Amino acid sequence: MTLPVWVAAAARAATEALLGRPFSAFQLLELPDRDEPFAVSVTSAAVLAGGEQALSISHCDPGPGLDLTRGLEIWVCVQWQELVVGVDDELNVHSEAWLNLVAGKGVGTLGSGGEACVSRFARELLSRNLYPLVPSGRGLRLEVVLPRGRDLAARTSNAAFGVVDGLALIGTQADVQVSASPDQLQQTIEQLRRQSAASDFCGAMTLVIGENGLDLARQLGLAVQPLLKIGNWLGPVIVAAAEAGVEQLLLLGYHGKLVKLAGGIFHTHHHLADGRLEVLAAMAVREGLPLDLIRQLGQADSMEAALKMLEAQDPELVRKLWYRLAATVEHRSAAYLARYGSWSIAIGAALFDRQRRLRWAGPQGSQQLAVLGVTPEDSPISLSLP
């Protein structure tokens, strides 16, 4: 189950405690994407502050896949509050007028001090399962705390999408979509085939890594051609695109993910393969960076730290390095594809940074973006790959 499901279970248990009901270790949740209620376990629930508040704890279990939220402790604290003035409760049965969702420690917000980053699915899940418990004429203040949220968020690309201070409560369904699983790969390939078989398909497609990358692609106006969100099986999806007759394929992703392709790593799940800093250091050698600087790159804590270090010393050098990297992604992707057959397909790469800025594209990527009326912030340069 995705993180929002475990938050909703704890929220329901806390609300029942606030109502004076006995604790139940399993909460029956109404899930938007299921016909029958689903039992979700919670660890504990108790009233606080003389019965004015209630706290419940649950632990996230995302299923058999590899997921950093496994075992994540979730605290939900609830208390009654007044309804928002001027809102007709009868007309807002499933609105959020009665629900005040507060981002506690470890929950990601949209910018420092901003509102909690919560998906529509997560909000609907809370609304469905809490509204029936809230007495008429009352509102509910609900604070979510993820004690390890900020530490875990440092291992994600949340900051690339403006999410700071913790984990976002995102998800579009109850079940975890395991991006490293063969089943997820098959679903992605089937969707690709449907898109390429459409009567209005013009031969061009954009592969986007992750849900947030998909949102960025739409903001950039790339939805004029098919967009396909993919997980970690980049290599097989590239081959499937060629087999389906795609002629112009654009890979759009966060630089910390696509850098792996420049190293020939085409299954990118972090539990299976990393090597990002090593690839960056190799690119730096080819670009002729000083040896001391290359050593510092290899010792950096993260890709973002390496990028900041380089930009502080020589912004122009950074521009050349990252365009070499984008061009190498294109080159290695074409080489990967050539192992499996011969197709007439141009593969472009476009990379964005943690500030959600489209920064770099390789030669093919720059051409494909230009057709769509999009230009990376850093202008392209000519490169000659070895």
Swiss-Prot record:
S-adenosyl-L-methionine as UniProt keyword: yes
**EC number assigned by the record:** 2.1.1.195
- State the UniProt keywords alphabetically: Cobalamin biosynthesis, Methyltransferase, S-adenosyl-L-methionine, Transferase
Gene Ontology biological process terms, A to Z = anaerobic cobalamin biosynthetic process; methylation
Identify the metabolic or biological route this protein is part of. Answer: Cofactor biosynthesis; adenosylcobalamin biosynthesis; cob(II)yrinate a,c-diamide from sirohydrochlorin (anaerobic route): step 6/10
Reactions the enzyme catalyzes = Co-precorrin-5B + S-adenosyl-L-methionine = Co-precorrin-6A + S-adenosyl-L-homocysteine
Q: Which stretch is the leader sequence?
A: none
Q: Which GO terms describe its molecular function?
A: cobalt-precorrin-5B C1-methyltransferase activity
Keyword Methyltransferase in the entry? The reply is yes
Q: Give the similarity note.
A: Belongs to the CbiD family.
What name has this protein been given in UniProt? Answer: Cobalt-precorrin-5B C(1)-methyltransferase
Q: Which organism is it from?
A: Prochlorococcus marinus (strain MIT 9303)
